[in-house]
């Protein structure tokens, strides 16, 4: 029951404010399922909605013989040293599945917490079965002062005419290195929406999820990233449009206040009549730091439509002066501009997830200004 889970959050020694930083709720009525993992141990998992399954990957493999067929199906074990590290017997992670035709609007919540291990190895499998709709919010964080590495393998399967939105909020520490490896398969008529939020300091994040998008399917990636002094973030998204009339959109908002950001984006038009748009915008808030945008558009057929726009710079003084003329102080004007820059309205995202994103951005403002 959810009441028991509230106690387990307390046992982790994480206060409610830290949980809020990664969108974690303690109210059963606001979630359709929950999963909580500390280091390599799945502490609790439950489903509160008939059309969704939530369990550890170990339990899923015991319950269903076919789950093993989804392991390393769209990612290679030998992709790099970090995928090889994750291919171990003690790996754990979440298994979340919406049943055929189920409409799960209330989000499933997954929390991955690094408490004391040197390397947290996770392998997650998410399946949105045919005609279903599934929304997930994943909050990843670490115990204050702990040094370590999070290696997260995630494979997403969006079946025919299904829709999956996945919002991931990270809040680590300057002693944590993060190496997610993610792939997504979007079948005919399916929709995948990814929202990645990183606003707090971290030692290093390096991630480049890839979506394989089939006929009449859509993949959308949104990211809001802040790098404070000492943080290095190498992040991007890739979409392979491999089916006729498939679509992709990659939108990133990056802010450097002394940190280093490499913002990547890659759309491959590998079928006729596909469309893709890539948008990279960066904001420099200090004299130090770096934002390096690396967009790539690749057309393999003549009748594709791929577009890109990018801009990196500082806050324009004219914008500050305009808001000050409307009665705001200089600090208030800068705060309003930064908040507006980070906010991305995502069509089709449930209000509960929109609110989690807005709340996370508001909490991060105090460290930016």
Swiss-Prot record:
Belongs to the iron-sulfur cluster assembly SufBD family. Pfam families: SUFBD_core (PF01458). It comes from the Archaea. This is Iron-sulfur cluster assembly SufBD family protein AF_2365. GO terms for biological process: iron-sulfur cluster assembly. InterPro entries: Fe-S_cluster_assembly_SufBD, SUF_FeS_clus_asmbl_SufBD_core, SUF_FeS_clus_asmbl_SufBD_sf.
